[in-house]
From Swiss-Prot:
Residue ranges that the Swiss-Prot or TrEMBL entry lists as coiled coil: 13-56
Gene3D superfamilies referenced in this protein's UniProt entry, alphabetically: 1.10.220.20, Arf Nucleotide-binding Site Opener,domain 2 (1.10.1000.11), Pleckstrin-homology domain (PH domain)/Phosphotyrosine-binding domain (PTB) (2.30.29.30)
Pfam families reported for this sequence: PH (PF00169), Sec7 (PF01369)
Chain spans, region C-terminal autoinhibitory region: 386-394
Organism of derivation: Chlorocebus aethiops
Name of the featured protein: Cytohesin-2
Residues in PH domain copies: 259-375
PANTHER family: CYTOHESIN-2, GUANYL-NUCLEOTIDE EXCHANGE FACTOR
GO molecular function, one term: lipid binding
Domain text: Binds via its PH domain to the inositol head group of phosphatidylinositol 3,4,5-trisphosphate. The PH domain is necessary and sufficient for plasma membrane relocalization.
Binding site for a 1,2-diacyl-sn-glycero-3-phospho-(1D-myo-inositol-3,4,5-trisphosphate): 268-275, 279, 290, 300, 338, 349-350
Length: 399
């Protein structure tokens, strides 16, 4: 036995040499195994470091993406710019459209505002966005339900016009032969949206029946009439189930009154009882709201400014007066509503709204601000223009 290692006494010199070689090889293998263990340990440490680094990168990317969505919801153009600059989004219409279509964490009002812009990139994104919608074999109401749920229509007439034109083109491409032209699809789409408002808005008392809906849409199919069965199906669908319009957190009344065009104390002459009452007025979003106190969360009355005009008037009882009125009025009341003392919401009772400002200067400022806010209903304007185009085209085709 040498160094504690047993060695049989009857080994030949050759066997001893072979045994020595085996022992040496064993020692070499043990050293090699130890070296491999150390290398494996180093490799595992490197892998763990890489994984931690990748996890950190993923976390950082997710944080930047969340920041980009927040920026988009506050300012769509700056939000897209931030995402592109941080390589979170490719600067192509198709990729931006896909990002908006998925809509994860995005404010649908902001999506609508971005899609409605007239810049070249926005227009290309709008068409790419519409192309992501599959309308094949859907009737018009079904297609509109899908389309109008993916964003919130902006308020500006020109933006609405571009978006509904893109919708009509896509619908006709997916469903060839249903309508003779995109103009027909465009006009009928607006008629359906207006029908939805008329049937389901509690402030609209005069609910149109099927016959009136059919009559409204006579001659819009390149001068011809659409099948009554088609119109009946659309009417029944809207009557039975209104459009679901996406609501965002930013659309509550608090947000509406957060940054008004003008606000201040004015005197308002009553409708039935001709007494002057001091009210806090807020002008925003083409509406005039009035409150009993500045701290009230809900307005006492709402006056939509669509189709109204404003003029200065002299009143023997109050100075600095102006009026809101309907041009060429034939006895109809201004469409408005107010809240009674018992909480009931009722229609207003004014053919004109007479208002008195504290000073001449404030009167002039209110008149200027209201004139800038007064609007004609874009739906009716655009429908009239498109129907006129269809009519002219039909006359040109006649021999």
């Amino acid at each position: 036995m040498e160094d504690g290692v047993y060695e049989p006494p009857d080994l030949t010199p050759e066997e001893r040499m072979e045994l020595e070689n085996i022992r040496r090889r064993k020692q070499e293998l043990l050293v090699e195994i130890q070296r491999l263990r150390e290398e494996l340990s180093e490799a595992m440490s490197e892998v763990e470091g890489l994984e931690a680094n990748e996890g950190s990168k993923t976390l950082q990317r997710n944080r930047k993406m969340a920041m980009g969505r927040k920026k988009f919801n506050m300012d769509p153009k700056k939000g897209i710019q931030f995402l592109v600059e941080n390589e979170l989004l490719q600067n192509t219409p198709e990729e931006i459209a896909r990002f908006l279509y998925k809509g994860e964490g995005l404010n649908k009002t902001a999506i609508g505002d971005y899609l409605g812009e007239r810049e070249e990139l926005n227009l290309a994104v709008l068409h790419a966005f519409v192309d992501l919608h599959e309308f094949t074999d859907l009737n018009l109401v079904q297609a509109l339900r899908q389309f109008l749920w993916s964003f919130r229509l902006p308020g500006e007439a020109q933006k609405i016009d571009r978006m509904m034109e893109a919708f009509a083109q896509r619908y006709c491409l997916c469903n060839p032969g249903v309508f003779q032209s995109t103009d027909t699809c465009y006009v009928l789409s607006f008629a359906v949206i207006m029908l939805n408002t008329s049937l389901h808005n509690p402030n609209v008392r005069d609910k149109p029946g099927l016959e009136r809906f059919v009559a409204m849409n006579r001659g819009i199919n390149e001068g011809g009439d659409l099948p009554e069965e088609l119109l009946r199906n659309l009417y029944d669908s809207i009557r039975n189930e209104p459009f679901k319009i996406p609501e965002d957190d930013g659309n509550d009344l608090t947000h509406t009154f957060f940054n008004p065009d003008r606000e201040g104390w004015l005197l308002k002459l009553g409708g039935r009882v001709k007494t002057w009452k001091r009210r806090w007025f807020i002008l925003t979003d083409n509406c005039l709201y009035y409150f009993e106190y500045t701290t009230d969360k809900e307005p006492r009355g709402i006056i939509p400014l669509e189709n109204l005009s404003i003029r200065e008037v002299d009143d023997p009882r109050k100075p600095n007066c102006f009026e809101l009125y309907i041009p060429n009025n034939k006895g109809q009341l201004i469409k408005a509503c107010k809240t009674e003392a018992d909480g009931r919401v009722v229609e207003g009772n004014h053919m004109v709204y007479r208002i008195s400002a504290p000073t001449q200067e404030e009167k002039d400022e209110w008149i200027k601000s209201i004139q800038a806010a007064v609007s004609v209903d874009p739906f009716y304007e655009m429908l009239a223009a498109r129907k006129k185009r269809i009519s002219v085209k039909k006359k040109q085709e006649q021999p």
